[in-house]
């Protein structure tokens, strides 16, 4: 029950309904299993950067389960991911990263400062945006999709994103 596949460098981070699986994809035709991190049953998008993986667990859907949270994993040692912190959420879906922030689709759009992963700080919360997926293009552009359509934002000032375009 795979939910997402996030390629990062020579690895694949695979979010499933029961956990995150990490594969070495140095040989593209033969990915090699490295490890997994099990979590409560739920839908599971995952994104990562150098040493951290960010996992949203969304319950109450076809994925079953009733947990709604954001997990942050230490993946310095890809063979042994460690849970650093869990944050309760309302109903998290997609998420995207920049070097300094997390853009999280949960009860609208939440923008979190991630400088200290053990103590995330909410920078902004836009409850009027009913979005379910997020993609960042560098540290400048955020793409969102949801009930209202497809959005493009300038995020050079993360606390004050500026809508550039919207397709309904």
Regions flagged by a language model, labelled:
Residues 1-168:
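Feature marking well-ordered beta-strand scaffolds used for ligand recognition
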């Amino acid at each position: 029950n795979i939910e997402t596949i996030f390629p990062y460098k020579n690895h694949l981070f695979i979010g499933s309904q029961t956990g995150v699986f990490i594969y070495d994809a140095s040989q593209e035709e033969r990915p090699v299993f490295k490890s997994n991190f099990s979590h409560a049953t739920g839908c599971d998008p995952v994104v990562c950067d150098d040493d951290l993986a960010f996992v949203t667990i969304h319950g109450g859907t076809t994925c079953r389960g009733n947990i709604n949270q954001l997990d942050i994993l230490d993946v310095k040692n890809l063979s042994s991911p460690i849970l650093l912190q869990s944050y309760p959420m309302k109903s998290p879906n997609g998420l995207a990263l920049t070097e300094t922030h997390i853009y999280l689709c949960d009860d609208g759009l939440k923008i979190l400062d991630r400088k200290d992963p053990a103590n995330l700080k909410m920078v902004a919360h836009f409850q009027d945006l009913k979005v379910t997926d997020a993609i960042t293009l560098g540290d400048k552009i955020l793409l969102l999709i949801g009930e209202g359509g497809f959005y493009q934002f300038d995020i050079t000032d993360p606390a004050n994103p500026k809508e550039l375009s919207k397709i309904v």
